[in-house]
Amino acid sequence: MAIALKGDFIGFSFNEHRSESLGIVRISDGSRYNEDLVPTTQDKTVQVPGGDGFYYFGSDYTQRQFSINIAFDELTEKQFRELQQVFGTKELGKLIFDERPYKYYMVKSSKPQLKYICFGKDGERIYKGEGTLTFTAYYPFAKSIFKFLNEYGNKNKDEWKEASGMKPEKGTYDIVSNNGSISVYNAGDLETDFILKFSLPIDNTPIGDIKITLSKENVGKEEAFLDLNGFSKKGADTGFQINTKTNLIEGFNAEGLTGTLYNENIIQGDFFKIPPREEGYQINVTGATPIEIVYDYIYY
């Protein structure tokens, strides 16, 4: 016997299409629910030459799948066609569950299956039945929709706000101070990359050496750093950004990234990430003043 989920577990959205507007509802078959706590992993191993067993070199997360059981009671022909259009797309879309509306997965819909009976009602064809929607997240983690609780207007906020790890409001976080320091906080489950943006002089005046560090407030020890030689702009660049996901220093202008790279100006140090769920971290910059820092919270 299928049981419709109650309360905040009843809905989800895909590609900004709400489940209730599509005429469907999530259901249970009456047994316990299954959920993967973490994405699928793939071990990196090499067989021991001439011996037993394998050498283990760690694991990589690969992908994550979601299967959603649904039911529909009075689905019209128009809604049936809309289901085909929404879940038949080959493009990636945002999947958001109502019980955790602070994060989204980028997923692809695949093999939606429906079982139904069809009958007439008031001169219109009506569908009643059940089905399964399957989604694959090739990037296996979720990202934050917003970063601070006051940006959410969900009625069930009290149920998930603590689990989200988010701060009530932005306050002084992510703002460049006069001395070049930026207070950062990562509410996610995993360390997160960031993009740090700088402007370049309009003329060809070179900028001086730049040092970027990660440390905790009121603690002198640097946990990570990246040092750059002074350099001048290239071509039509109006700025550059340090991207710790791609490990690139990229030029940009008003039209976007220009394809110019400045990695040859790295003297020493490494690209680094922001640790999760730890208070007091700040990114300090000397030699230049950033104009913006951009990062997401990454969740399982």
For each of these PLM feature ranges, what is it?
Residues 84-91, 147-156:
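Charged, amphipathic alpha-helical segments and their flanking helix caps
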Residues 96-146:
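Short beta-strand and beta-hairpin "edge-sheet" elements
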Residues 49-75, 125-141, 279:
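Oligomerization/assembly interface segments of phage tail-like spikes and tubes
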Residues 150-300:
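Intrinsically disordered, low-complexity segments enriched in serine, threonine, and glycine
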Residues 1-45:
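Polar/acidic, low-complexity leader/linker segments enriched in S/T/G and N/D
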Residues 6, 18-28, 104-111, 221-231, ...:
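Short amphipathic beta-strand/extended segments with alternating polar/hydrophobic composition
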Residues 4-9, 87-92, 206-207:
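A short, compositionally biased
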Residues 71-115, 280:
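Short, acidic/charged, Gly/Pro-enriched secondary-structure junctions
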